Amino acid sequence: MIKFFNKVYRRRKKVSNTGKIERATIMEVDNFQVVESYKQLRTNIMFAMSVKDTTIVELSSSYPGEGKSITSANVSIAMAQTGAKVLLIDCDLRKSVQHKIFKV
């Protein structure tokens, strides 16, 4: 499943030869299975939040390149699509990428 996500979500930039990876959000992907996977993850997180009366979700990992940024962006988009208030904070002070994902 992870290899499937890597193939769908990571594509080489056509303009730059730097080898950087462009990340696509669920707003840009036409693959139904990928979008539904993130919506299922959103539903599971929202259910767990309602059971424990939690308002904060943290995604973390000890290794770089495991998909924390794109997963948090896509889960945030999926939650916002339900009408929930979402505040996504990029706490990676050295290599922040959320502004690149959302093109701001």
Range-by-range predicted roles:
Residues 50-104:
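Walker A/P-loop NTP-binding active-site region of P-loop NTPases
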Residues 1-18:
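Long, basic/Gly/Ser/Thr-rich N-terminal segments
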Residues 1-4, 28-36, 68-76:
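Short, mixed-charge, low-aromatic patches
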